[in-house]
Amino acid sequence: VKLGLFFDLRNPGPWARPSVDHVARSIDIVIGAEAAGIDAVWLSEHHLFPDGYLPQPLAFACALAARTSRVRIGTAIMIAPLHHPAHLAEQAALADLISNGRIEVGLGTGYSPEEFALFGQSLDRRYGRTDATLAELRRLLDGGIVTPGPVQNPFPLWAGYQGPQGAARAGRLGVGLLSLDRNNAAIYAEALEANGHGASSARLGGVIDLIVCDDPEATSRRLVPHLAWQRQTYAVARGVEQTFEQAVAGIEAKLAETGRLPGLPVLTPDDAVDLVRKRTDGLPVEHVYLWASLAGMPDDLVERHVELVCSRLRPALGGA
């Protein structure tokens, strides 16, 4: 299993630093993590978020490619219906050249009406359009059509699909599946086999929501507003009416009731290793990635989390 860090470059108002400094610091975190042994970094895409969420992952991938030499750099995910396939293919090929063959491209459908309106697109048929974009990327990148072409052939493509229908779609396309849902692995493998790709070509990857630390109880308390910010902004993007204060109150109530943050395990390194193994054992998992930072998370928590991921989790999980 290749272990990675997941970046969205959020820089929320309550904890914001100048954008130039924030981007530079994010690059420095990647450089340091590479030196400490991390296998990959993965980048997400959103638009119009109030905290400067990363809007152009492949542009940032090029910056990382120029400053690193070994880590793989993936997108998880780019919103396919907001991008022309030829434009995507050219960007991916150039990033692959800059990195000397270290790019992975994962695409998904998106869900935010505001994002689609920004690009003059409709949410209608977004699943079919994402399928078509993945197929066209395969043709453009592997067929020698875009110039200059990428280093890698075949080019590593992923579908950020969830649920049984998404697993079947990824299998039909013959691409990797960015989902660690154990219930869908067999559906994905069967679709690969049925469509001539071979079940042995199955590649799974995905995020595990997890923060690693020395003191889970104290760290959990400090993470409440940052988790609330992340959850509230995602909810608003999906059309749910919720304030930041409501999100904080809900998470604080859950923490008081259970002693745990809802949906975010905060664990010591040994417990974190056990969790990742439980999620991945017996599956054809190629990549697992954890958030590098959570919406303005304090620097000391970020630094210790990244240090423990690199020094304790990666060796235990047999990173490549």
Regions found by a protein language model. Give the residues of each.
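N-terminal beta1-alpha1-beta2 module of alpha/beta enzyme domains
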Residues: 1-68, 72
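N-terminal small/glycine-rich loop or linker at the start of catalytic domains
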Residues: 1-17, 112-115, 142-153, 242-261
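Short, acidic/polar
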Residues: 20-32, 91, 161-168, 271-279
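Internal, glycine-rich beta/alpha segment that forms the wall or movable "lid"
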Residues: 84-201
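Active-site mouth loops of central-metabolism enzymes
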Residues: 9-23, 78-86, 154-161, 213, ...
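An alpha-helical appendage that flanks or caps ligand/catalytic pockets
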Residues: 124-147, 185-286, 318
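Alpha-helix-loop-beta-strand connector modules within alpha/beta enzyme cores
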Residues: 51-75, 129-136, 307-319
